[in-house]
């Protein structure tokens, strides 16, 4: 009987200590919280070269913070990495310029980025014409 009472008291003590530790951990996380609601974020600056992992600096009143960010290596530098566009299909090849053109409309501006409403992208016309394959290679019906 005494062993059972000891185990119950021990269990209650362990639960009380662990809940207090969790409460302290939660309060510790709140210390860094801010009253600011109007954050102004700068553009993502890569750590090396012109794409990959980087940092973005934000300010609110007299407070400054840095966030980790990432610039995809296939982004269009003219548009900015924080501006997301929905693009149409590529147009026909222009024989005089030797390029195909397509336009995109702004879908989303991240971190209050200053983005153009519509943009145009161009790429050189391909020299080869793609032909449809007549049969599947590899695994399949034989």
Curated annotation (Swiss-Prot):
It comes from the Eukaryota. Disulfide bonds join 36-60, 44-69, 51-73, 83-115, 93-125. Gene3D superfamilies: Heparin-binding Growth Factor, Midkine, Chain A- C-terminal Domain (2.30.90.10), Pleiotrophin/Midkine, N-terminal domain (2.20.60.10). GO terms for molecular function: growth factor activity; heparan sulfate proteoglycan binding; heparin binding. One of its GO terms (cellular component) is extracellular region. InterPro entries: Midkine_heparin-bd_GF, PTN/MK_C_dom, PTN/MK_C_dom_sf, PTN/MK_diS_sf, PTN/MK_N_dom, PTN/MK_N_dom_sf, PTN_MK_heparin-bd_GF_CS. In adults, expression is highest in the brain, eye and bone, with lower expression in the heart and lung. Not expressed in the ovary. In the tailbud stage embryo, expressed in the head and tail regions as well as in the central nervous system (CNS). Its main location: secreted. Keywords: Antibiotic, Antimicrobial, Developmental protein, Disulfide bond, Growth factor, Heparin-binding, Mitogen, Secreted, Signal. One of its GO terms (biological process) is positive regulation of cell division. It holds the Pfam family PTN_MK_N. It is found in: Secreted. Residues 1-20 form the signal peptide. SMART domains: PTN. Belongs to the pleiotrophin family. Secreted protein that functions as a cytokine and growth factor and mediates its signal through cell-surface proteoglycan and non-proteoglycan receptors. Binds cell-surface proteoglycan receptors via their chondroitin sulfate (CS) groups. Thereby regulates many processes like inflammatory response, cell proliferation, cell adhesion, cell growth, cell survival, tissue regeneration, cell differentiation and cell migration. Inhibits mesoderm formation and promotes neural formation during development. Plays a role in development of the neuromuscular junction (NMJ). This is Midkine-B. It comes from Xenopus laevis (African clawed frog). The lineage of its organism: Eukaryota, Metazoa, Chordata, Craniata, Vertebrata. The gene is mdk-b.
């Amino acid at each position: 009987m005494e062993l059972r009472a000891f185990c119950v008291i021990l269990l209650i003590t362990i639960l009380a200590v662990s809940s207090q530790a969790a409460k302290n951990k939660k309060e510790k996380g709140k210390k860094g919280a801010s009253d600011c609601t109007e954050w102004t974020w700068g553009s993502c600056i890569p750590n090396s070269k012109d794409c990959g992992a980087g940092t973005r600096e934000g300010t609110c009143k007299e407070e400054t913070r840095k966030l980790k960010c990432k610039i995809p290596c296939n982004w269009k530098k003219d548009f900015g990495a924080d501006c997301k566009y929905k693009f149409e299909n590529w147009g026909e090849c222009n024989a005089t310029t030797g390029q195909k053109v397509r336009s995109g409309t702004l879908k989303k501006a991240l971190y209050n980025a200053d983005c153009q409403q519509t943009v145009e992208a161009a790429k050189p016309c391909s020299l080869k014409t793609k032909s449809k394959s007549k049969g599947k290679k590899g695994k399949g019906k034989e």
